[in-house]
Amino acid sequence: MSLAWRNLQKPFYLETSLRILQMRPSLSLGASRIAVPKLTLHTKHSMPPCDFSPEKYQSLAYSRVLAIHKQHLSPVDTAYFRKPLLLHQGHMEWLFDSEGNRYLDFFSGIVTVSVGHCHPKVSAVAKKQIDRLWHTSSVFFHSPMHEYAEKLSALLPEPLKVIFLVNSGSEANDLAMVMARAHSNHTDIISFRGAYHGCSPYTLGLTNVGIYKMEVPGGIGCQSTMCPDVFRGPWGGIHCRDSPVQTVRDCSCAPDCCQAKERYIEQFKDTLNTSVATSIAGFFAEPIQGVNGVVQYPKEFLKEAFALVRERGGVCIADEVQTGFGRLGSHFWGFQTHDVLPDIVTMAKGIGNGFPMAAVVTTPEIAKSLAKRLLHFSTFGGNPLACAIGSAVLEVIEEENLQRNSQEVGTYMLLKFAKLRDEFDIVGDVRGKGLMVGIEMVQDKISRQPLPKTEVNQIHEDCKDMGLLVGRGGNFSQTFRIVPPMCVTKMEVDFAYEVFRAALIQHMERRAK
């Protein structure tokens, strides 16, 4: 099945009245006209069509949900919005709340819903497997686990062919840390500032986003190094990123020579020479930083960094929790966009389209090193239901050409949103690759100081009120993360763009008062 049937939708234009902004089908195919209204906080958009009607919500009242949450669930405040959404149902790139309101999901459950909410094929496979076998643990064989291992390993280059199935990204990175230390016989592991590799006691040492750090000792043997951020970091230019959109910073580099990369490599060398032992265990890197706000490194940086790590006896770990499974478009795995071959790859989130599963893939040599030192076991890792769902997700990605859709629609989306940088002084940077885009908000383009969190919060609320859900990221929560399910269409991107632009206009109107 391809996505062609989902693209047969009418184009729209914006029709405005004194206070209402609406999208209506245009009279002729391909025609579009946009009237720029004076927007207010009551602006509404008509959404692109959706061929799905949700069931009527008949569960807990909203007030009861709030009471239960306050009394029985974690007091850590992670919910978005002043009045958190009570979601009820999902269909592909759409979400529905308890009141029947429809939202275009451009955050995908934190970059997790890869092929679409409740994808029909994945749901059918889950229902079939749930009536057959839920759980055995890996002390018994079952075909879903072996079928999935064969399918997944076929998508990875040699010698990355040994798979450890686990339950979450934190658990996967936790295991990868143990693997690196067991294989190298060393302790020190390096990760970037701004990196997010999990929230378990072990992986918190690798995670270097301030709000996730604890005021107690932890992270023994973990060392941070400067993130080669070509927008917010000290060096960057106009050719650095593997992206159709570059920074607005000037440089005199030739297209095939990046001075910023060289300077960041010198910083990496300085970390190796001053902050870790002569021999190290490894180096963790996300191909593109997710939680830190879709931060991209200079081209060729990871290739040189991997070589330096291996000179010290360390292994190189690619954290593909957010970048894997075709989301970046040009390649199936993020590490391939850097032309590197890691020793260990971790993956989660999109692997199960929201079902809790994860994996660590490594070489036979590293796997044997772990086996000699640890009887590794995971009760739920390799669960029959998880593996059946994982196989279905891989099949959908291939059958519906979702990697190609990520490339085509993602590039369209990135170039479209990049227009906002030219229009609004508070949009400092638009960056990304495929269906992974970051929009960094600033006070002004000269200082690049982050837009205050209260202002970013209001823009976020306005997007939600107009039917668009986006994520947040960055050390100062200053970057909007645009990461829709991989089945998204250009028409839906157009809607998201108009909503986001309207939210920015509303914000500028508030500022002017």
Curated annotation (Swiss-Prot):
GO MF, one annotated term? pyridoxal phosphate binding
Catalytic activities:
glyoxylate + L-alanine = glycine + pyruvate; (R)-3-amino-2-methylpropanoate + pyruvate = 2-methyl-3-oxopropanoate + L-alanine; 3-oxopropanoate + L-alanine = beta-alanine + pyruvate; 2-oxobutanoate + L-alanine = (2S)-2-aminobutanoate + pyruvate
Q: Which cofactor does it need?
A: pyridoxal 5'-phosphate
Q: Which GO terms describe its cellular component?
A: mitochondrion
Means of activity regulation = (R)-3-amino-2-methylpropionate--pyruvate transaminase and beta-alanine-pyruvate aminotransferase are inhibited by aminooxyacetic acid.
> Where does this polypeptide localize?
Mitochondrion
* UniProt-listed GO biological process terms: glycine biosynthetic process, by transamination of glyoxylate; glyoxylate catabolic process; L-alanine catabolic process, by transamination; N(omega),N(omega)-dimethyl-L-arginine catabolic process; positive regulation of nitric oxide biosynthetic process
Q: Name one Pfam family in it.
A: Aminotran_3
List residues modified as N6-(pyridoxal phosphate)lysine: K349
The answer to keyword GTP-binding applying to this record is no
Q: Which residues carry this modification: N6-succinyllysine?
A: K70, K261, K303, K416, K419
EC number(s)?
2.6.1.44, 2.6.1.40, 2.6.1.18
Which of the seven top EC classes does this enzyme belong to?
transferase
Q: Which domain of life is it from?
A: Eukaryota
Give the UniProt keywords, A-Z. Answer: Acetylation, Aminotransferase, Mitochondrion, Pyridoxal phosphate, Transferase, Transit peptide
Phenotype of the disrupted gene, per the record:
Knockout mice are hypertensive.
Q: Where is this protein's transit peptide?
A: 1-40
User: What is the purpose of this protein?
Assistant: Multifunctional aminotransferase with a broad substrate specificity. Catalyzes the conversion of glyoxylate to glycine using alanine as the amino donor. Catalyzes metabolism of not L- but the D-isomer of D-beta-aminoisobutyric acid to generate 2-methyl-3-oxopropanoate and alanine. Catalyzes the transfer of the amino group from beta-alanine to pyruvate to yield L-alanine and 3-oxopropanoate. Can metabolize NG-monomethyl-L-arginine (NMMA), asymmetric NG,NG-dimethyl-L-arginine (ADMA) and symmetric NG,N'G-dimethyl-L-arginine (SDMA).
The record's subunit annotation is: Homotetramer.
Annotated protein name in UniProt: Alanine--glyoxylate aminotransferase 2, mitochondrial
Q: Which organism is it from?
A: Mus musculus (Mouse)
The organism's lineage? Eukaryota, Metazoa, Chordata, Craniata, Vertebrata
